[in-house]
Amino acid sequence: MNNSINHKFHHISRAEYQELLAVSRGDVVADYIIDNVSILDLINGGEISGPIVIKGRYIAGVGAEYTDAPALQRIDARGATAVPGFIDAHLHIESSMMTPVTFETATLPRGLTTVICDPHEIVNVMGEAGFAWFARCAKQARQNQYLQVSSCVPAMEGCDVNGASFTLEWRDHPQVTGLAEMMDYPGVISGQNALLDKLDAFRHLTLDGHCPGLGGKELNAYIAAGIENCHESYQLEEGRRKLQLGMSLMIREGSAARNLNALAPLINEFNSPQCMLCTDDRNPWEIAHEGHIDALIRRLIEQHNVPLYVAYRVASWSTARHFGLNHLGLLAPGKQADIVLLSDARKVTVQQVLVKGEPIDAQTLQAEESARLAQSAPPYGNTIARQPVSASDFALQFTPGKRYRVIDVIHNELITHSRSSVYSENGFDRDDVCFIAVLERYGQRLAPACGLLGGFGLNEGALAATVSHDSHNIVVIGRSAEEMALAVNQVIQDGGGLCVVRNGQVQSYLPLPIAGLMSTDTAQSLAEQIDALKAAARECGPLPDEPFIQMAFLSLPVIPALKLTSQGLFDGEKFAFTTLEVTE
């Protein structure tokens, strides 16, 4: 817990303190009082009866002693249960393909009052300009949008080509809570001075981790360097060991990486202060149809029998404490009045949301969205410096009898397996093998890096995207070079987006005009477009639930086992480039 940084975020003047204390004593009229409400006690379990008294942004008092207290306005909760606003401990808003403004409109009415965001997707494409835009959005947002300074731009030096560099000078910005996920864990473990310098610069804040599957002495060394949390755990014993060694565990349930079922059995009354919830990457279709952090809480309660107060604890208070946001996470005197009223606490049915002491109206958020987005001055402009391609760019030569490496996909997981397949005159000995290529898009004029992909389920057609973690070069998979070229040229021509090609034609396309990552459409419109895109993709075969999100991680070298970057095939276990042909 980072009490040392709490002063950075808890801004309240002496005059505000005096007014708050006067309302607490009952000497001054409150701004709001929420009546007919039960407060879920996240510390002891059970419930607290009585009103919630609000002055300005803060809670002045709770409990039956305020039953007759005066207020300028009273809110009848109609028997609802009050819980603290939900907090997402780690996410990339860009992965929702929504702008921060649109993301707030879509998620704040669902009770998501605070996010800890790492904008390293747009930073990898645009550098300082991308981070500055996120900071502007955070400043004007009703939602508490905190930022982590991106630590790895690119994810690993020398493994890929990205669009920009980035400095760490943002650490003193008022919305910055720490250093974002340190993905180069081999570099940290080996004691590379450049990485240790980054960690030293942020030791007064939080140091986020990223170490999927790490164990043994290597995990001990990574934690000894000061890394405080990890959101990449995907196995029960892996998560348990990280908790034992003092690491905080972020339990992730995104659109591609779904680890909640594996890790939820770890959560109990004792370790819940060390457990948090995060989404990492979640698309607007799932947000609209299933929810955000509210969906994760619901599953903890309904599917894993986590007690109510523990489920809501890991969704709020645990995360607030971890990041030193001590003014958040509890419904208690002096805390910021971020309140979610639930008509059904077990089903996480949100009745009303207050943030910073003010009720939220979803229709008002929607009506103001366009003007607020314009006010944030988004960084428009074409970020794709790549000439059109032809089918010959994807031509690979194979020798009968030779064995070739295949990136083997695991549906709904970010990790892959490294497999191999033998080529004959009739093709490969596996009928699920298709082609994959990554094309650098930042003007370096590299030839496409090509490889083989298995287990994805693509039987025909091609998919292309400018969303490919973390450098966001162009990634394409396909059954034919001609359709791969058609899909790639569509996203080049339009300045970025997601494309489905089948039967020699573009079947569906989603434009992403901001950095090739984000749309400026509303959340509802974007969800509808994604629905159409996924429907078109399903015509190509039995693909993963979220084919474009799964495809986007096939180029991220810091997650094992075999990936493809713009510079070639990368062994994520040996942390070294390898060859397509198996020669050893």
UniProtKB/Swiss-Prot annotation:
<dbReference type="InterPro" id="IPR026912">
    <property type="entry name" value="Adenine_deam_C"/>
</dbReference>
<dbReference type="Pfam" id="PF01979">
    <property type="entry name" value="Amidohydro_1"/>
</dbReference>
<keyword id="KW-0464">Manganese</keyword>
<dbReference type="GO" id="GO:0006146">
    <property type="term" value="P:adenine catabolic process"/>
</dbReference>
<dbReference type="InterPro" id="IPR006680">
    <property type="entry name" value="Amidohydro-rel"/>
</dbReference>
<dbReference type="Pfam" id="PF13382">
    <property type="entry name" value="Adenine_deam_C"/>
</dbReference>
<protein>
    <recommendedName>
        <fullName>Adenine deaminase</fullName>
        <ecNumber>3.5.4.2</ecNumber>
    </recommendedName>
</protein>
<dbReference type="InterPro" id="IPR011059">
    <property type="entry name" value="Metal-dep_hydrolase_composite"/>
</dbReference>
<comment type="subunit">
    <text>Homodimer.</text>
</comment>
<dbReference type="InterPro" id="IPR032466">
    <property type="entry name" value="Metal_Hydrolase"/>
</dbReference>
<comment type="similarity">
    <text>Belongs to the metallo-dependent hydrolases superfamily. Adenine deaminase family.</text>
</comment>
<dbReference type="GO" id="GO:0000034">
    <property type="term" value="F:adenine deaminase activity"/>
</dbReference>
<dbReference type="InterPro" id="IPR006679">
    <property type="entry name" value="Adenine_deam"/>
</dbReference>
<keyword id="KW-0378">Hydrolase</keyword>
